[in-house]
Amino acid sequence: MSDSGFRPIAEGYDDRQDGCLFCVVRSNEFLDENAFCYASKDAHPVTHQHALIIPKRHVVDYFDLTELEVAAIHQMLIAMRNRIKNDDLTVNGFNIGVNVGKIAGQSIPHVHVHLIPRRQGDVENPQGGVRGVIPDKQKY
């Protein structure tokens, strides 16, 4: 199999978007990293240890990520989940989410996946989970 399909990925890591918060993060601010992404604390956490998984290449839309980047992000989600659960035994669930486009709540035009630790009693009734982005549709 040729690696030519991955050449733009490697070349893209040298290109950063001026003014992009996620393109200028210093590696000493990383919680963890792999070849294609890094984990960072959320600046405005929903819960304690809320993390962001961010591709190193500047990509605005999640659906424009390569399969390699998606796989690397998934591996990082697992690594961070394990780290959080080992650090905090009160964590017994997670929400994972991506906002794609301003209309969906994307506030920074660089892909980032939220990993939000959940604890018993952190909300009165968690039924519906991420469906709560449309409050009238959360309960079913």
Where do the language-model regions lie?
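HIT superfamily nucleotide-processing domains
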Residues: M1-Y140
